[in-house]
Amino acid sequence: LRKYINYLVLLLLCACVPLASAYAQSGPTAAETVSEKDCGITLSGTVTDHERRSVLIGATVVLEGTPHTSVTDANGHYHFHDLCPGTYKLVVSYLGYTSERLEKFFRAPEVVNFRLHPDALLLRSVEVRAARQREQPTQASSHLSGRELAQTQGQSLAQALERMTGLSSIQTGPSIAKPVIHGMHSNRILVMNNGVRHEAQQWGSEHAPEIDPFVASELTVVKGAAGVRYGADAIGGVILVEPKPLRDSAGTSAVLNLVGVSHNRQGVVSGMVESNPAAVPSLSWRLQGTLKQAGNSKTPDYYLDNTGYREQNFSAAAGWTREKYGVDAYFSRFHTKLGVFSGSHVGNLTDIRNALQRERPEPEADFTYAIGVPYQNVTHDLLKLHAFYRTGPSGKLHLTYARQFNQREEYDAHGDRSRPGLRFEIETHHTEALWEHPLIGNLKGSLGASYQYQFNRFEGRFFVPFYESHTGGLFWIERWEKNQWHLEAGLRYDYRHLQARMYRKDTPQRTGQAGPDNELLTPTHTFQNLSGTLGAIYDFGPHLNLAFNAATAWRSPTTSELYSNGIHHGTGTYEYGNANLGVERAYNFMATLAYVQNKRLNGEISVYRNYIDNYIYQEPDTVPTLTIRGAFLTARQKQANATFTGVDVSASYQLTEHLAFATKASLVRAYNRSADEYLIWIPTDRYENSLRYTLDKLGAQGTFAQNFIQLSGLAVARQRHIPDNYLARDYAMPPASYFLLNAEAGTTLQLGKQQVEIGLIGRNLLNKAYRDYLNRFRYYADEVGRSITLRVSIPLHF
């Protein structure tokens, strides 16, 4: 215990070193902040009428205490360019309206939108958005941007999202994680990458989203059924990965990010450069790339064999924007080679029993960056072309085309190691037309149509067949706002045609009919259904609002759920599909009470209930499947009526000027109504508390800015809401509850005009050995032990 305490004290002392230098230094004034020129920050936004949402032309926006003033243009936009990081006081005024004020610290380009009230109305709160302008959704949503997002650098997308309430991840060892929203994941969660629906082999629990988190300036999660806007399958929610808009002011800037992680000796280098040429102001472009390498991960007591990975990612964007129209293009490539924990691939029934009983996995391993078999090689390309045309003062037509190509190669520990045992290739073409119609009184909305073509093929041993699908959709969403009320309604129709191709020998247990093994089968499925949403928000005052949403969504079974028959490489299981599966239909109800933008207390509580008819789930079969390659754990697809009920709570309280306390909790219960029992593999209860100490300026002339240190504790309960006779469904009981002590610290070092942002994160500081219920490899090994992450970000301006 003394050793653990010494480690913790040493970490806290290292993070607090700057505090001893100049605790009494005062923060900068706005005037001091803007005295440095060419710092490169752009502050912009729109000024509108709060009730009618019409733009206010000629509104004055002043940075109080500085000579900077901006007047809104014909679209209600204002701009400030080349600002330095610091605290600014914005004052917005317009004849006949009550002025608005906002004091805020800005460290990066932001969009701040103001909604002014006529003089007869009370002063309202200011809406702040760190990305594109958006309406407040009637569903619960969470955002991650700015410094909080930067603190997640080096983590996967799923790990970054765990900072939000209601989100967790399902893991397959230490290197693969998929996001979970309110107990649902994979095909029930849509990921929108730069406005394009991410399409890959997402049916696999070990198929993490092929997205580089460094491309995002904001991550947004819409919780609950969201099928109207984003299409069928969005039963659990939607994850929006949003890059920042292309630069709209003349100049060139760049950023270099460096990350090091201790538990797997991971190193990350990521860079971005963007420009808006002064000679061609309508043109903007951006280049971005990331290199990542990690070796075997270490638990408190041993290394996990063959758990290293490598990534090489690249993206490029360019846009041409005029007052009435604009076009832009985006291309990204994600490539990774990642090892699959060798202890999960066993050879016979005795190996399975021994693996479940032993405390340490076999084979024993040391640290290495080498990646052996089994491993996966994954490449994902995305090409997006987008154009818009303004159809009036507030209307806009969007046209989008996207092509995605995903190749997944899986190399086995058995057989020919020079070629993949299985190669998947899936190609997707997606088009969408969206019209945001002009304001009609207090009504604003959008209409759209989409079409998607998809083709999947494979080489090697059979697991999922060839298939071809056509999907089309029509949607209409309207929003009415007046005074304290915000009402939203939407309707969508989707149609899907699916045809698979396979030989009878690959599906004998599901066809129910005799025939020659080499007979080609082409089963066809047609699905069509409606999705709808109805929501409302009522503002009680500047800080308090209540939102309610009722929505329905649906999901057709995937090809893997219908026809899988083989070894699922990443999980080391033999999976059987079910050709008799029907369509899932979800009815989601959610209410959110939020108290926000208060100087001392802020909080939010969301309660939800999601009824899902014909819920498709995978259940382990305790009888392993024997193959010529060995014995494998077995899983089968089943269907039942289910109910998901839960609550998300988050709150923060400013104890003093510098010290804040925050807490959050997420609870979800998933019940099989058909069998009158709980469902398996559902997230357990999670509770997290933190104390955060901040100090704006330290050192001579504020050398250290935005200083903070945070200590937090995460408690995860044992999953006790499980079916009776659990060991008839799974190979081991849910693991014990656990507590993790974590810490973070950060500062921004000011070296003349050059800034260097430094962050230090410690996870599992007590080096606790534990296993997580949602890790598919919990049968074989512990989770990662103590891990220290050092992050350095260097912005550059030219």
List the predicted regions and their residue ranges:
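C-terminal beta-signal and adjacent terminal beta-strands/loops
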Residues: 8, 613-614, 661, 715-724, ...
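Short, acidic, small-residue-rich periplasmic hinge/interaction motif at the N-terminus
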Residues: 27-38, 46-51, 59-64, 93-97, ...
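Short acidic/polar hinge/loop motifs at secondary-structure boundaries
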Residues: 81, 196-223
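N-terminal periplasmic accessory domains that precede
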Residues: 111-115, 157-160, 177-180, 192, ...
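Periplasmic-side early beta-strands and strand-to-turn transitions of outer-membrane beta-barrels
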Residues: 240, 276-372, 509
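Membrane-embedded beta-barrel scaffold of Gram-negative outer-membrane proteins
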Residues: 258, 287, 397-412, 545-551, ...
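Outer membrane beta-barrel strand-and-loop segments of large Gram-negative receptors
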Residues: 419-434, 576-582, 588, 595, ...
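Gram-negative outer-membrane beta-barrel transporters
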Residues: 608-612, 629-719
